[in-house]
């Protein structure tokens, strides 16, 4: 209090009370942001405090999506016969690309016409850095994309995995071509195995998405391949657990298996069964 011009302190002041130490926020030579850091609200505030208003950043890569198949109809188009389906791959893949830091470009649906496949790929490559195609890579009579992709610098022609066995990866100069199967579940798994890794390296944001979890229940593997099985992730008594509740068995066309808090349980090629409560590797999707 102040009385007659005299300041009286009635309480003992703790040492360093209301004192900000020199260098408490950061010290000379300290690294505050590293290459590849994603700039959020805190990082931007830090740059503003330091007086940086022009900085060098990575240009977002453009991921193009080119879905193929005579059976496909786009959104808003009517299905003219029972053999036709609505295209969903381009929706899933474009949004996945955006969620992992890229800009997405969706090209018109490509028909199963051999003479149109290579020109469509070439045209798409002019507008994107990574081109993802879906369909046309399996063993069908009208699967023309596989031959077209093989004309480029082929890196991967096939993998012993399920789903996504017929995935192909090629390069055209500095650009990537990723040819995925037409089944939606397969294409979404293939994205996480390939496109996500490429984008992470491109943007210097590599991340390990594989963690350990305990399997609630058991699993019997029927294929001779390395499998990626849709599962639910939960926390139980401080442990990460997965289960297969509600996951439908069937073809690689089942989109809903990746809904909600899903992950991919990795079942090694040499395994046939996984016992209850066994510790397994799972791949997170985000």
Feature-to-residue mapping (PLM):
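Short, glycine/charged-enriched hinge/interface segments at domain edges or termini
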Residues: 1-106, 248-249, 286
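Glycine-rich loops and low-complexity Gly/Arg-rich segments
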Residues: 7-8, 22, 34-35, 57-59, ...
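Generic structural signal for well-ordered, non-membrane alpha-helical segments
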Residues: 15, 22-25, 40, 86-90, ...
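Flexible glycine/proline-rich
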Residues: 26, 148-286
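Helix-rich terminal scaffold detector
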Residues: 56-180, 184-189, 201
